[in-house]
Design a protein with these regions (language model features):
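ABC transporter nucleotide-binding domains
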Residues: 2-7, 12-211
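C-terminal coupling/interaction segments
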Residues: 270-314
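ABC transporter nucleotide-binding domain
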Residues: 172-269
């Protein structure tokens, strides 16, 4: 498998002081859907703009399909389709006119009618952009990225604000591009989206990659297999912290402990060993269990454990 995107020791410093990217290295294979996750200010946008050739790094090397921006920028731009989180499209144009406009920027674009059909926009081809729904606008933004017949698709928060049906329609479009051999670099605030779409992903914080791998491997390696969430209170209905976190950490099969949304969350391998010991510990404290649930560990658990906050809190 060939390498589609590669960067080595990427650094970007603003005003000689603020380090937005700190020695970041990535290698994305052709045909992969790769996710870049991180809180606001983590360096994701700066990294992507450097990879897209829009921003010059302070130091480090970038290679797109084996070529450098310094040597072959004009041809390389033909290979990239870019859809930003809030792509600004003229409301005075029709859907067809918008796609035709973007197609005119490239030497060998795809058929506009073909792209409109693929994005399920044929019936809206003569509608004004200003009259489209949120989901239709997002599909149009992706259409403007696909009409150039790209080899690599950069998608920045492609489904933000969409209803579940519109999100799934875009997921199928992304999967279709990937099935045809395309490479996708995706940023998203939706953990379920990253788990469903991404073959591999990297979590970025403070300009550095702090974890990288497939969603399943990251969950297994960093999130535990299961999560036990609980809250306790005093028997007299007063508040009780229910013991320090260190007290829960010594329970059987517990890998990590954190406070999460007013509850204690335990990452565990074998909940059938943890829960009886937890109930016994709560009883010995003289406390009352107010809430108890178990679930499969998720990518969200990995993110919270690594960064200390939920991605949607940003």
């Amino acid at each position: 498998m060939t390498v589609a995107i590669q960067c080595r020791d990427l650094r970007k410093t603003y005003d000689g002081k603020v380090e937005a990217v700190r020695g970041l290295s990535l290698e994305i294979q052709t045909g992969e859907c790769f996710g870049l996750l991180g809180p606001n200010g983590a360096g994701k946008t700066t990294t992507i703009e450097i990879l897209e050739g829009l921003l010059e790094p302070t130091s480090g090397e970038v290679s797109i399909l084996g070529h450098s921006w310094r040597e072959n920028a004009r041809e390389m731009r033909e290979w990239l389709g870019i859809s930003l989180q809030e792509t600004r499209l003229s409301e005075k144009l029709t859907v067809r006119e918008t796609v035709e406009l973007f197609a005119s920027f490239y030497r060998e674009p795809r058929s506009c009618e073909e792209v409109l059909e693929e994005l399920q926009l044929t019936e809206k081809a003569d509608a004004w952009v200003g009259k489209l729904s949120g989901g239709q606008r997002q599909r149009l933004a992706v259409a403007t990225a696909l009409v150039c017949n790209p080899k690599i698709l950069f998608l920045d928060e492609p489904t933000t604000g969409l209803d579940p049906q519109s999100r799934r329609q875009l997921w199928e479009i992304i999967r279709g591009f990937q099935r045809d051999g395309g490479t996708v670099l995706l940023t998203t605030h939706y953990m379920d989206e990253a788990e469903r779409l991404c073959d591999r992903l990297a979590i970025v914080d403070h300009g550095e990659i702090i974890a990288e791998g497939s969603p399943a491997s990251l969950i297994e390696r960093l999130g535990g297999h299961h999560v036990v969430e609980f809250a306790v209170g005093a028997k007299d209905n007063g508040s009780s912290e229910g013991g320090a976190l260190a007290e829960w950490r010594v329970l059987p099969s517990v890998e990590s402990v954190r406070e999460d949304d007013g509850m204690v969350a335990l990452s565990v391998k074998e909940p059938h060993l943890t829960i009886p010991a937890l109930l016994d510990a709560v009883g010995k404290q003289g406390s009352v269990l107010q809430h108890l649930t178990t679930r499969q560990a998720s990518l969200e658990d990995v993110f919270v454990r690594l960064t200390g906050r939920h991605l949607r809190e940003e």
